[in-house]
Amino acid sequence: MFGKLLTKVFGSRNDRTLKGLQKIVISINALEADYEKLTDEALKAKTAEFRERLAAGASLDSIMAEAFATVREASKRVFDMRHFDVQLLGGMVLDSNRIAEMRTGEGKTLTATLPAYLNALTGKGVHVITVNDYLARRDAENNRPLFEFLGLTVGINVAGLGQHEKKAAYNADITYGTNNEFGFDYLRDNMAFSPQERVQRPLHYALIDEVDSILIDEARTPLIISGAAEDSSELYIKINTLIPNLIRQDKEDTEEYVGEGDYSIDEKAKQVHFTERGQEKVENLLIERGMLAEGDSLYSAANISLLHHVNAALRAHTLFERDVDYIVQDNEVIIVDEHTGRTMPGRRWSEGLHQAVEAKEGVHIQNENQTLASITFQNYFRQYEKLAGMTGTADTEAFEFQHIYGLDTVVVPTNRPMVRKDMADLVYLTADEKYQAIIKDIKDCRERGQPVLVGTVSIEQSELLARLMVQEKIPHEVLNAKFHEREAEIVAQAGRTGSVTIATNMAGRGTDIVLGGNWNMEIDELDNPTAEQKAKIKADWQIRHDEVVAAGGLHILGTERHESRRIDNQLRGRAGRQGDAGSSRFYLSMEDSLMRIFASDRVSGMMKKLGMEEGEAIEHPWVSRAIENAQRKVEARNFDIRKQLLEFDDVANDQRQVVYAQRNELMDAESIEDTIQNIQDDVIGAVIDQYIPPQSVEELWDIPGLEQRLHQEFMLKLPIQEWLDKEDDLHEESLRERIITAWGDAYKAKEEMVGAQVLRQFEKAVMLQTLDGLWKEHLAAMDHLRQGIHLRGYAQKNPKQEYKRESFELFQQLLNTLKHDVISVLSKVQVQAQSDVEEMEARRREEDAKIQRDYQHAAAESLVGGGDEHEAVTAQAPMIRDGEKVGRNDPCPCGSGRKYKQCHGKLS
């Protein structure tokens, strides 16, 4: 109550932010008259003027008003479009490391030109990031004339470009592209073998369109570059035949599992577990098929891989449904994004789940892959010096944007007042009653000529509704992942008089539904249209537009509530753009997933008390509140999972930072001779310590063992025992120095034989290849550690602390092994000439050709001991150093308590 009173007196934080920015809008508007008088040449010259001022020490803030006024005037001349004041506000929000919530139809694409131009003036590059190739190309081509008029270059970064094309795209002032491509390019750059192979510049300013989709929905999906692992498709096929023999355990309203059964499903957590009876049954079936030895347990250490396959098969059969979670197309299982309803070709569930689904559907089973490099969008985008985003629905996730990314959300007002009528939900007892009510509402809308957009949560539901409409002879269009090729065409005409469009959550995000249909698209379909043809098309459209407005505008009809309020708001946001008329309503039933799992008891009890009859709906604020509370519960749970996964992921950030930074230093260095010298002192010294313990008596020395080890691993044949027999005064330290010097002399002889330049190149190639191989193995070890770490909780240990401790130990091993292996290889390999280095490079490029890019969804339960099977386990990612460089004798920033040179600085 007091909070509301204070807001009334002082205004909300959002209001105060906008009030502060409004002063700059006034300054921009004051410049408009003067800028209108400028010639084109004078307006274009502003870009060079701004750059000179920045070079002289001016800040971006000091030139913002003039820069925005320049873009607004250029837009008027190039596009005949003037930025509204609210778009200027949006541009300022985006320049200040914030997220701008701008409603559908408010011109986010044009708004983005303001901060993109301003930040491109620094010459460091601007990345404008969208969710798919179509939107990236469309926005780049649409805005190219404006930016080129102002003297800036525009690049497009999409899938399928070659290295030179990508480098050109990144060197442009403003680069449009998809989040996936930017992430993959970062990974590829950190696998490059020469500076020339890198394509990205340092990450400066990212402006993300549909920021909620990328930073929230995609947050847990790691981008993975992988290579093929061993083929186990036969095992998946054999185990797939076991699952149909299993019976699900009954479940009553008491939430207690009762009755006989082999497995139980927890629908809230989206998990499945074997019962004791189920474990015994599976073991017996495996024994019958000769896959498990008589008397052996599926849970013994030797059978962990078999257990992994059985669990994957059970999840595939019980938790993943065709046409809901995936579709089968061209003999492939393709994941359907639960948030957008779009298919995601190329993405695969990890931990064998995708192969298990392929076995279930009887399609070709692709090999499992081994991770070579990976990063999550969370960690990739946190590396940008400046980060901003825009979307129509961010306010419900404002806390997460602030907590995870440090980004405040500002709700930008609409240019015209919102007049859409959002009606209360109607709740029915059964799905059949709900669908009959939906059909009746659609018929009513068609009678008065009102266009309808029907939003569904799955492909299966959209096809069910389509069948009902065919039965009722209602003309309609279906827009789902199976028919996405016609997406732009269907969305363009979804606002025509009396049209009915059924859409999954994708609902053509990024494309506005224009009342009366899209007249621009009609003109585009004509070859060289005349002015008369254009005028006629526009006049016809105006008549249709007025008819639709008179009928009530676009009517949004939701067939089910999504787990996230944000997705529901996105659907509602399709109507009421730019002050248009419109309406929305959700139809629900007690059989809907959200209602059944989270809100059933309270609402169904209320409905029973009211004594509802068949076909009757309940419409009450209490019901809407109960549903919203259910959605809040799910959102909070999903946020906790994302937060927890990120906490685990952050443990590995230091490691990736060290490896990638060291890799780039190695690649950029002309020579790593000093590094090799430091490493060889450490490696040879460590080997000597094993056979001649420091400060020990000679009786404890193992000289024969040391001689043999030095010869086997470093090709160093030294008469150490002979030295000791002949020289009584040869003590431990001088012996150590003599052995290290002997290795140095042998290596010097190798250098004289092949030439210093060839050996320097070879050293770099060996170091990079060894580091990459060990990093790949380290990633696999970290994956295995993550998958089982939650079990430490049963031993009264903190899984996060255990993960931190053990991952640090694994990294220590990586550093020690790297140094040892590099010196061992350099000692053994005989380099004859430059051709040997080139041959090594050729083999490496051949291996590179075999790697593939994956977007793998992994089960969250492996990390947190439970959770949504659709959640993805985050992967390690590097961070950019915020403060000063750490000195070699300073405490290591990882928190181990050791000096930096003895910890994460060991490689330097």
UniProtKB/Swiss-Prot annotation:
Q: Which reaction does it catalyse?
A: ATP + H2O + cellular proteinSide 1 = ADP + phosphate + cellular proteinSide 2
Q: Where is this region: Disordered?
A: 876-908
One Gene Ontology term from the biological process aspect of the record = protein import
Give the EC number(s) under which this enzyme is classified: 7.4.2.8
The record describes its membrane topology as: Peripheral membrane protein
Enumerate the cofactors the protein uses.
Zn(2+)
> Which PROSITE patterns does this entry report, sorted A to Z?
SECA, SECA_MOTOR_DEAD
Binding locations of ATP = 87, 105-109, 512
- Which amino acid positions bind Zn(2+), per UniProt? 892, 894, 903-904
Q: Report the co-factor binding details.
A: May bind 1 zinc ion per subunit.
Q: Where does it localize?
A: Cell inner membrane; Cytoplasm
Any one Gene Ontology cellular component term annotated for this protein: cytosol
Gene Ontology MF terms? ATP binding; metal ion binding; protein-exporting ATPase activity
Which residue stretches does the UniProt record annotate as biased composition, category Basic residues? 898-908
According to the UniProt record, what class of enzyme is this?
translocase
Q: Which SUPFAM superfamilies did the record assign?
A: Helical scaffold and wing domains of SecA, P-loop containing nucleoside triphosphate hydrolases, Pre-protein crosslinking domain of SecA
Q: What does this protein do?
A: Part of the Sec protein translocase complex. Interacts with the SecYEG preprotein conducting channel. Has a central role in coupling the hydrolysis of ATP to the transfer of proteins into and across the cell membrane, serving both as a receptor for the preprotein-SecB complex and as an ATP-driven molecular motor driving the stepwise translocation of polypeptide chains across the membrane.
Q: So what family is this one in?
A: Belongs to the SecA family.
UniProt-listed NCBIfam families: PRK12904.1 (NF009538), secA (TIGR00963)
Tell me the protein's name.
Answer: Protein translocase subunit SecA
- Give the species: Shewanella baltica (strain OS185)
